[in-house]
A protein has these predicted regions:
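Charge-rich, low-complexity N-terminal segments
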Residues: 2-138
Length: 138
């Protein structure tokens, strides 16, 4: 009998395919400084609106960014998206340009934007979403 023969009743090596939509989240950390200030408004308005966050010298944060992709796992890999690939996308689109930078002054894609949490989410989404390969969706 050849060494590669299968035992009687043994199952094939083809994996079972599970179906359904899943959500997979990756977290990344970065540090950055920013200033909340609307140049179209007065200094007094900015100080009332943003308080210490309007400090002319800015202030810093330790950011935690969570990115979730949605989709059905690929039957061949079991992945919605290889998390290593998502990590590379986040490194290239967010961490490399933003980590240890002044978001108002040093990050080109944030210039002219008030870097509130809400605006950062929108700006980051705009950079990450086009990089996520289908069928995964941000």
């Amino acid at each position: 009998m050849p060494a590669t023969s299968r035992r009687r009743g043994a199952r094939s090596a083809v994996p079972r395919v599970l179906t359904g939509t899943v959500y997979v989240t990756r977290q990344v950390h970065f540090n950055a400084a920013h200033r909340l200030y609307n140049p179209a408004r007065s200094r007094a308005w900015n100080e009332r609106q943003y308080g210490l966050c309007a400090n002319p010298r800015g202030h810093g944060h330790n950011y935690l960014l969570e990115v979730t992709v949605r989709g059905e796992p690929d039957p061949a890999t079991g992945y919605v998206l290889d998390l290593g690939e998502l990590k590379r996308i986040l490194q290239r689109t967010i961490l490399d340009p933003c980590d240890h930078r002044n978001l108002n002054e040093e990050v080109r894609f944030l210039r002219g934007i008030i870097p509130s949490t809400e605006n950062l989410v929108l700006a980051f989404w705009g950079r990450i979403a086009p990089e996520v390969p289908p069928p995964a969706v941000l």
